[in-house]
Amino acid sequence: MIQSLRKILAVAVLAVPFAANATIFQFTASLNGVNENPGSANQGFGSASLKYFDQGTASLADDRFAFVLSAISLGGVATAYHIHGAASFAENAPVRIALDAAPFVTLTNAGGTLVVIGNNVVAPVLIAATPVTGVNAGHPAMSFLQMLQSGLAYVNVHTTAQPGGAIRGQLIQVAAIVPEPEAYGMMLVGLALMGVVVRRRKQT
């Protein structure tokens, strides 16, 4: 069942309408307790994938992103999960995007397993300059895409036992893609699958 869900999510995460001149930037994160600052004793681990759709327009407000987070062996229910920034591996930073609230959908959060998806999410235009704790004194204001491309965004999952953070992973860029025309058909398939997943969740 988990494998089937992952296959559905792999396609559904692409279900974001984009312009012909759009560029897709892909970021991934590996989450574990060692990455927490300070470290966490939580034995869980997970992965996250974020696809940022740069629409190629003058306004960053037109940009969208899709997101998938999955984690297992958390030792209990996740109490909160967010994207934080701007911060390097050795730093902590404020919450920038709440993954446990709309428009994100939590498909599973039980028995130490967490699965979250977000589709066609409006990308934040500006990440305000905020002092962070850690090695550096702080980072200047920047766009969400700049924060991602600088490796200064991280995913953090919290539990009752580790309210400050159970597992964490830095989002790292792995690809930049200009979609070919045939990719638009894949977008339609992704949209259909996303609808199926959400409907099944509502029925359970």
PLM regions: where:
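N-terminal signal peptide c-region/cleavage motif recognized by signal peptidases
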Residues: 17-19
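A short, hydrophobic C-terminal helix/tail in secreted or cell-surface proteins
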Residues: 179-199
